[in-house]
Amino acid sequence: MKKIIIVSGYFNPLHVGHIEYFRKAKAYGDKLCVIVNSDFQRALKGSKPFMNEEERLCIINNLRLVDYAILSVDTDGTVCETIREINSLYVLMEDEGVRLFFANGGDQTNDIIPEREICEKLGIKLIDGLGEKIQSSSWLLDNEK
């Protein structure tokens, strides 16, 4: 059975901690799908703009570790609807040889993420604690010179 690991984030900017997150997530499965949070979501979060969503998506799409990268369609701070759409693609293809997983970095646990409910409803397994928090995009932006 093919395992597809889904991860998400703002990646604004992308840093070494994100690469480690991708590396550890990819080790759990056969393919890595990265959901890039949109500019709308970044504004909701209140973080500084550094790169727009298209630039972030392009960079993530061109990383060797990443098999698929997509822009979040959600209109809140979650990626619940995007996860639902990814799941629907595999249901429509009737690909029963695929198992989906949603993975979180070391600073997140499955007990606190808003995506937990949709993942459980759709039968998507949860993985958490993928490494320690190595860097912070917010810290990098706040300390840029």
Could you tell me what each predicted segment is?
Residues 1-145:
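Nucleotidyltransferase catalytic core that binds NTPs
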